[in-house]
UniProtKB/Swiss-Prot annotation:
Signal peptide: none
Keyword list, A-Z: ATP-binding, Host endoplasmic reticulum, Kinase, Late protein, Nucleotide-binding, Phosphoprotein, Serine/threonine-protein kinase, Transferase
Compartments, record wording: Host endoplasmic reticulum; Host endoplasmic reticulum-Golgi intermediate compartment
Higher taxonomy: Viruses, Varidnaviria, Bamfordvirae, Nucleocytoviricota, Pokkesviricetes
Protein name: Serine/threonine-protein kinase 2
Reported function: Essential serine-protein kinase involved in the early stage of virion morphogenesis.
Domain of life, per lineage: Viruses
Any Pfam family matching the protein: Pox_ser-thr_kin
Catalyzed reaction equations: L-seryl-[protein] + ATP = O-phospho-L-seryl-[protein] + ADP + H(+); L-threonyl-[protein] + ATP = O-phospho-L-threonyl-[protein] + ADP + H(+)
Enzyme Commission numbers on file: 2.7.11.1
Modifications after synthesis and translation: Phosphorylated in vivo. Autophosphorylated in vitro.
Hydrolase in keyword set: no
């Protein structure tokens, strides 16, 4: 039997580094550097002791803290211009249905709770193995349009995240109750709490209180105040009522400039585009070329990302032209940014079959499934596309669907257009700015 390397489908089943019941894929140095800054075993006193602690404060004592000059600007929300990461901490930047994401220095760290009863640890590696496999097999600049994780740790104990969330939630509850002169209690209504938190989170007085209480009560280098309401929705969702937040994966990524959905007209022009619509054409074209080149690879005409949408496309600096050859044409991108496909958690390619999606798809799909969903989400994210009649009319060719064959933008029926459909589409004058360098 030959030796499997990371350009082979078998790579996902390899276990290069073992630490008891955990596995590290990729660069151990990156991974261990991040892990050395995390305390996976941090514990706190029971909530009742926190309640007793807050009995030492009232509206008057909180007022004295508010009058203090000290303020930790990292407790502002990240979209607030006053936000500044003054410590080398983990800053919460996103929580979605399948991961909790933090930023530290030039890294992005994603924690994913896995259903260990459904999948073995090695069956949850697609987010690392699929992009790595594609990057190593693609031969041209198209490989630059993929986000590869630097490292991935499998089967790590992640209970500390849920414990930390509960500790911060209790602190916020008791702090808000003290501010309002209410009787202290750890019982709460989701609607009432979120309303109270959202009303205060941008207040400089509230941030001063957080600057005092977060270090004293939480004493952690993980700051979850940013976008805390997203974390709240994740952990409090009724479908996770009996969920065991036990084990999962830790993935280390390079830090991007933005996700594609964050670009508006002002930012598009700042990035060097003539308009927002030109920027949208740019990301569409780069993703289309990536798919075409993947489908050219042997045995890769089954590639599915399964969640191709603007917020799963990241933008990075591009220090040199990206040139991609297709038949007798070459596509030249001189922009100072590039788009790169991210979040391969539900993807499959070649012999790397993903059990997470295998049972969800009742019919066979190919690239068209992804682009049908992509176009729907582009039009929803950017209604400005409609102003470009030629472009918007062309995009409608991807979404000629009805309620019977499309549910929440996702195809329910098998439509297997050949990849030549996409090849012909991107040869149109719509993309003339990039075809043969715009000549």
């Amino acid at each position: 039997m030959g030796v499997a390397n990371d350009s082979s489908p078998e790579y996902q089943w390899m276990s290069p580094h073992r630490l008891s019941d955990t596995v590290i894929l990729g660069d151990c140095l990156y991974f261990n550097n991040i892990m050395s800054q995390l305390d996976l075993h941090q514990n706190w006193a029971p909530p009742v002791r926190l309640l007793n602690y807050f009995k030492n404060f009232n509206k008057e004592t909180l007022l004295k803290i508010e009058e203090n000059d000290y303020i930790n600007s990292s407790f502002f929300q990240q979209k607030d211009k006053r936000f500044y990461p003054i410590n080398d901490d983990f800053y919460h930047i996103s929580t979605g249905g399948y991961g909790i994401v933090f930023k530290i220095d030039n890294y992005v760290v994603k924690f994913v709770f896995e259903a260990t009863k459904l999948y073995s640890p090695m069956e949850t590696t697609a987010e690392f193995t699929v992009p790595k496999f594609l990057y190593n097999n693609l031969k041209g600049d198209e490989k630059k349009l993929i986000v590869c994780a630097w490292a991935m740790g499998l089967n790590y104990k992640l209970t500390f995240l849920h414990t930390l969330y509960k500790r911060v939630l209790h602190m916020l509850l008791l702090l808000i109750q003290t501010m309002d002169g209410q009787e202290l209690s750890l019982r709460y209504s989701s609607k009432v709490f979120l309303k109270a938190f959202n009303e205060r989170k941008d207040s400089i007085k509230f941030v001063k209180l957080l600057s005092h209480f977060y270090p004293a009560v939480i004493n952690s280098n993980i700051n979850v105040i940013n976008y805390f309401n997203r974390m709240f929705h994740f952990f409090e969702h009724e479908k996770r009522t009996n969920y065991e937040y036990e084990r999962g994966n830790i993935i280390i990524f390079p830090l991007a400039l933005y996700s594609a959905d964050k670009v508006d007209t002002e930012l598009a022009i700042k990035l060097g585009f003539k308009s927002l619509v030109q920027y949208i054409k740019f990301i569409f074209l780069q993703m289309a070329l990536l798919y075409i080149k993947i489908y050219e690879l042997p045995c890769c005409d089954n590639f599915l990302h399964a969640d191709l949408k603007p917020d799963n496309i990241l933008l990075f600096d591009s220090n040199e032209p990206i040139i991609i050859h297709l038949k007798d044409k070459k596509f030249v991108f001189n922009e100072r940014i590039k788009s790169a496909l991210n979040d391969f958690d539900f993807s499959q390619v070649a012999g790397i079959i993903n059990k997470k999606i295998k049972n969800n798809f009742k019919v066979k799909h190919n690239w068209y499934y992804d682009f049908h969903f992509f176009v729907h989400t582009l039009l929803k994210t950017y209604p400005e596309i409609e102003k470009d009649i030629e472009f918007s009319t062309a995009l409608e060719e991807f979404i000629m669907c009805t309620k019977t064959d499309c549910d929440k933008y996702r195809l329910k029926v098998s439509i297997l257009h050949p990849i030549s459909f996409l090849e012909k589409f991107i040869m149109r004058d719509i993309f003339s700015d990039w075809i043969n360098g715009g000549n």
